[in-house]
Amino acid sequence: MSQLMEELSFRGLIQQQTDEEGLTKLLAEEKIKLYSGFDPTADSLHIGHLLPILTLRRFQEAGHHPIALVGGATGLIGDPSFKKAERSLNPAEIVEHWSDKIKGQLSQFLDFEAGENPAVIVNNYDWISQMNVITFLRDIGKNFGVNFMLAKDIVSSRIETGISYTEFSYVILQSLDFLNLYRNENCKLQIGGSDQWGNITSGLELIRKSEAEGAKAFGLTMPLVTKADGTKFGKTEGGAIWLDKEKTSPYEFYQFWINTDDRDVVKYLKYFTFLSKEEIASYEEKVQTAPEKREAQRRLAEEVTTLVHGRESLEQAVNISNALFKGEIKSLSAEEVKVGFKDVPSMEKSSTEELTLVDLLVESKLSPSKRQAREDITNGAVSINGERQTDKDYVLSAEDRIENQFTVLRRGKKKYFLVTYK
């Protein structure tokens, strides 16, 4: 077995492959071109895309040539794989904009300037848009029997609820991608999530029927990322975890990984980091002997946040996390307060206005009445920027404003309110 296949196997990154022996032999003998596709269904990739992206990177680090395919054409159609209902179609100009954004994100993970094996980005709109309907039906469509299509899980799962010809044809378009890359780039391997198995094997079938006898290509899928508690990976109460820091801040991103269940953390270290077997084994032992220290979760969060957002964003996320945990909010910069408390209720005040703590507690609804507010203060339940305040007649001063922009109020352990200044 090649060193790369051993690595992928150790990390649990192989769900299915079309010809294990053939692919193992090929990877041991030559450096190949491989691809994975990413349809632009939003203006950012999310953490569900990380597994195929990082697997492309593992292949590149082993000397192979990764191709990242942006589905500018297939994104206009919509992949029906394991979707319960028809997707709504997005306007072409929006899909084009999303495609450009995704290209930029992919460049964070793959090396496009590597001397021996630079990564390449392609867009399937470039070849699919050039093919007319007659050519498509005669040269491509004739290779797909209706019974063959209906037997695919991606189609059969939708027969009862209904599937349009548009989505029915998606698998053919994706197969055309593989054929095009095989012919023009000598690309011999497609990788993807386990939900892409039907699309990948259809592409292999098209290559077999369209090319000369002996043409050989391969498919490999990675497992569906699951969580031990049964909830969907990559989703929180606030929605998807995006790779774009404008949609999911580095702090929120870091917190997602910090909150990983003990039962999942070793698996995620294998999936999403480039730590060695020995390092992962040491964290596995720490999970078993001292789970309360959450050292494995911290390392996971550090590694993935650095991969996606860089060292500077990681440091900011750690600063915010530590300050909130220790109550040292005053140590944060205004930018860090803005990021860390972006989902906290807030109100705007003038920096010249006299603000009593009692009035702020009532206006912010942290306390239901002035009487209760005074009791909360004297009982030590109220803090300003993490520092307890017990003077019921306290009036806020300039020293209570972080960089003259924010004051963070807290009542009890978890009720926060943000005062901003104009």
From Swiss-Prot:
Record-linked InterPro entries: aa-tRNA-synth_I_CS, aa-tRNA-synth_Ic, Rossmann-like_a/b/a_fold, S4_RNA-bd, S4_RNA-bd_sf, SYY-like_C, Tyr-tRNA-ligase, Tyr-tRNA-ligase_bac-type
Record: residues binding ATP: 235
Gene Ontology, cellular component aspect: cytosol
Chain ranges for the short sequence motif 'KMSKS' region as given in the UniProt record: 232-236
PROSITE patterns for this protein: AA_TRNA_LIGASE_I, S4
Keywords for the protein's UniProt record, in alphabetical order: Aminoacyl-tRNA synthetase, ATP-binding, Cytoplasm, Ligase, Nucleotide-binding, Protein biosynthesis, RNA-binding
Chief place of localization: cytoplasm
UniProt entry tagged with the keyword Zinc: no
Enzyme class: ligase
S4 RNA-binding domain mapped to chain residues: 355-421
Pfam families xrefs: SYY_C-terminal, tRNA-synt_1b
A molecular function GO annotation: RNA binding
One GO BP: tyrosyl-tRNA aminoacylation
Compartment list: Cytoplasm
Keyword Ligase: yes
Gene3D superfamilies in UniProt: HUPs (3.40.50.620), RNA-binding S4 domain (3.10.290.10), Tyrosyl-Transfer RNA Synthetase (1.10.240.10)
Residues noted as binding L-tyrosine in the record, renumbered to the chain: 35, 170, 174
E.C. number: 6.1.1.1
Catalytic activity from the UniProt record: tRNA(Tyr) + L-tyrosine + ATP = L-tyrosyl-tRNA(Tyr) + AMP + diphosphate + H(+)
Function statement: Catalyzes the attachment of tyrosine to tRNA(Tyr) in a two-step reaction: tyrosine is first activated by ATP to form Tyr-AMP and then transferred to the acceptor end of tRNA(Tyr).
HAMAP family according to UniProt: Tyr_tRNA_synth_type1 (MF_02006)
Quaternary structure, from the entry: Homodimer.
Protein name: Tyrosine--tRNA ligase
Record organism: Bacillus pumilus (strain SAFR-032)
Name of the gene this protein is made from: tyrS
